[in-house]
Amino acid sequence: ASVVAETLGGLEYPSDALRENWQRFLWHQFHDDLTGTSIPQSYTFSWNDELIAQTRFAETITTAVGAVSRALDTKVKGMPVVVYNPVASSRRDVVKATVKMDKRPSGIKVTSQKGENMPAQLISWENGIAEVLFVAQVDPLSFSVYSIQPGRTSSSGKLLAKNGTLENTIYKIALNEQGDIASIFDKKNNRELVQTGKPFRLMMFTENLSTDYPAWEIYKKVLDGPSISITDNVKITVAENGPLRASLRVERTHEDSRFVQYITLTDGAEDDRIEISNEFDWQGKKALLKAEFPTTISNEKATYDLGLGYVKRGNNIENSFEVLGHQWADLTADDASYGISILNESKYGWDKPDNNT
């Protein structure tokens, strides 16, 4: 974005600021900082430096996108919104925008530069300010202008959240009474993805056998032993039920810890993706929290992301059980007929106890 902004003549390239903040960020890229195993006092410096770097990087990209936006043709019928895709691949995904609207609209109409009506949803309206969701499709490293105005919302009408179930054109998801995912049925392939009686769930191991490094050392016998499901004070509600995005909210507790999850499907975006957003107030001590996915897919090996590559690993063994994976892991059937990929934002420890999990 900064290169484009400079090319258009609107902004000098911020090389000094980028170098300074990149070096500040790299200062803390080593194992004690990243894994949370430094002494508590050191994190006074770590958090401060990371927050400064993050804030200044955000300012840099916001300033650059703003400079480019001012150079674009934003003459549209409604309120113009510029969407920037910073990655080197095309994207079609849900965008959240805040726009001015004098009156609360009954619906939202979003139009692309090509005149295509995009799926959209009104989240809220208060005091002339509307929060809107819409689907944007943007080429790699590119900018696109969209028009937002009151109007009829484009929808297939096949997105629904109710009574612990969530459904779109591809999946039907059912939760059990504990708030765990008991079923994911792929309607297009006529296939159940969750093992019968073994839901996708949060699980906790409370036996910590490490005496030297209890903050990070994990024993295989602990992972092979009993686990606790998070099932206290379960509340399942519908968080969203719009034409573009629908979500179930699951709230649970365990002792002093509180767990809130949002399970989300879309209609008109990346509809084959199930999103689970976690908001945890973790007060546990001497405990390990994991998410478990017992699938109906079988393979002795799973594939793990390494950032610039990938690696295949087998089931847990005595000297390799808690393993590294960056942002995704994939389990594809032996005959390559079907597969599931689990993407995650910031947790890099995985284990594979059997062919299906």
Regions found by a protein language model. Give the residues of each.
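C-terminal (or distal) subdomains of carbohydrate-active enzymes
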Residues: 55-58, 62, 66, 70-357
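Metal- or metallocofactor-binding catalytic centers and their adjacent structured scaffolds
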Residues: 1-72, 77
